[in-house]
From Swiss-Prot:
<dbReference type="GO" id="GO:0000162">
    <property type="term" value="P:L-tryptophan biosynthetic process"/>
</dbReference>
<feature type="binding site">
    <location>
        <position position="227"/>
    </location>
    <ligand>
        <name>Mg(2+) 2</name>
    </ligand>
</feature>
<feature type="binding site">
    <location>
        <begin position="110"/>
        <end position="118"/>
    </location>
    <ligand>
        <name>5-phospho-alpha-D-ribose 1-diphosphate</name>
    </ligand>
</feature>
<keyword id="KW-0822">Tryptophan biosynthesis</keyword>
<feature type="binding site">
    <location>
        <position position="94"/>
    </location>
    <ligand>
        <name>Mg(2+) 1</name>
    </ligand>
</feature>
<dbReference type="GO" id="GO:0000287">
    <property type="term" value="F:magnesium ion binding"/>
</dbReference>
<feature type="binding site">
    <location>
        <position position="113"/>
    </location>
    <ligand>
        <name>anthranilate 1</name>
    </ligand>
</feature>
<feature type="binding site">
    <location>
        <position position="228"/>
    </location>
    <ligand>
        <name>Mg(2+) 2</name>
    </ligand>
</feature>
<keyword id="KW-0479">Metal-binding</keyword>
<feature type="binding site">
    <location>
        <begin position="92"/>
        <end position="95"/>
    </location>
    <ligand>
        <name>5-phospho-alpha-D-ribose 1-diphosphate</name>
    </ligand>
</feature>
<comment type="similarity">
    <text>Belongs to the anthranilate phosphoribosyltransferase family.</text>
</comment>
<dbReference type="Pfam" id="PF00591">
    <property type="entry name" value="Glycos_transf_3"/>
</dbReference>
<keyword id="KW-0808">Transferase</keyword>
<dbReference type="InterPro" id="IPR035902">
    <property type="entry name" value="Nuc_phospho_transferase"/>
</dbReference>
<dbReference type="InterPro" id="IPR000312">
    <property type="entry name" value="Glycosyl_Trfase_fam3"/>
</dbReference>
<dbReference type="GO" id="GO:0005829">
    <property type="term" value="C:cytosol"/>
</dbReference>
<dbReference type="Pfam" id="PF02885">
    <property type="entry name" value="Glycos_trans_3N"/>
</dbReference>
Length: 349
């Protein structure tokens, strides 16, 4: 099916089959569709509502065409990632959580990009922390294997997505492409914590991940609108485990974390985000640092749980709390910074 035929279906409110969506996605990623057609597809799918089959097929094609790193043999391999688009400008919780998860003994292959709606995307923050993202595939694999944490800068792995950059920027709306980033980790990861911008997406995205072969996934959205597990409200969760999707609601008190407002956790830029994260992960914390540490523990605990290192989410949060207060996560961040700098210096000599 070509993109014009697909648009005709979509305007009639007809969902595309997986085979049809795969055809359309390939035409986009091979440069055969015009920017007007891509924009129309984005808007049409958004207005109709993207189906599980459409999202699955688009993600499968993106995975197929990605420049991959194969570290799928590593035990406890996990990604923690969000769609963005919540507009809250919170400090970068998922990136901070990555260092906690890695310090706990799991391996992080974090797929990320620059800020979508926040002022500090994962790549913005990491560069601010002195972590070199300008690494080739072999160097990135070394980070993952030797340091237990590596960052996969999305544009380096999904070069064919360049054809959608213009329409996405010009339209400025949430679209299927916001959903695809978290679903298309190029490192063979099968265990995920995925934050989404609407609770209505939790179960569908869990079902998509099931079709894509994931093993254990928590898809989360908080009642106060975050694509994270929130410190300030209930969080809706769809969990894929043992081939089944279950839905549940989490209150922070369920895992011995007191509910607190998000005041003090909003940041202006990546520099402010990094400062808050270092406060939260350090041995001595300010009052706001303590609050940020609790927020990180809630999310890192999910990553530890889905990785297989903890048998329950509650146990994962307790382990994350111990790691944060022991200072190992901040040490992991510092070591990765030095390692990536050394890799680049070695390559340049």
């Amino acid at each position: 099916m070509n993109i014009q035929q697909a648009l005709n279906h979509i305007t009639k409110n007809i969902h595309l089959t997986q085979a049809q969506m795969e055809d359309v996605m390939r035409s986009i990623m091979q440069g055969e569709a015009t920017e007007a057609q891509i924009g129309a597809l984005m808007m049409g799918l958004r207005m109709k509502g993207e189906s599980i089959d459409e999202i699955t097929a688009a993600a499968r094609v993106m995975r197929e065409l990605a420049i991959k790193i194969d570290v799928s043999d590593i035990q406890y391999l996990v990604d923690i990632v969000g769609t963005g688009g919540d507009g809250q400008n919170l400090f970068n919780v998922s990136t901070a959580s990555s260092f906690v998860i890695a310090a706990a003994g799991a391996t992080i292959a974090k797929h990320g990009n620059r800020g979508v709606s926040s002022k500090s995307g994962s790549s913005d923050l990491l560069e601010q922390a002195g972590i070199n993202l300008d690494l080739d595939m072999q160097q990135t694999e070394r980070c993952i294997r030797e340091m237990g944490v590596g960052f996969l800068f999305a544009p380096n792995h999904h070069k064919a997505m360049k054809y959608a950059v213009g329409p996405r920027r010009e339209l400025g709306i949430r679209s299927i492409f916001n959903l695809l980033g978290p679903l298309t980790n190029p490192a063979g990861v099968k265990r995920f914590v995925i934050g989404v911008f609407s609770d209505e997406l939790c179960r569908p995205i869990a079902e998509v991940m099931k079709q894509l072969g994931a093993e254990h996934v928590m898809v989360v959205h908080s009642k106060d609108g975050l694509d994270e597990i929130s410190l300030a409200s209930q969080t809706y969760i769809a969990e894929l485990k043992n081939g089944e999707v279950t839905e549940w609601v989490l209150n922070p008190e369920d895992v011995n974390i007191p509910s607190q407002t998000l005041s003090g956790l909003i940041v202006e830029d990546s520099n402010a985000s990094l400062k808050l994260i270092k406060d939260a992960l350090g041995r001595k914390k300010s009052d706001i640092g303590e609050k940020a540490a609790n927020m990180i523990a809630l999310n890192a605990g999910a990553g530890i749980y889905v990785s297989g290192l903890a048998t329950s989410y509650k146990q994962g949060v307790a382990l994350a709390h111990d790691i944060i207060y022991g200072g190992q996560a901040l040490e992991k961040m510092s070591i990765l910074s030095e390692f990536t700098k050394a890799l680049k210096e070695y390559a340049n000599n």
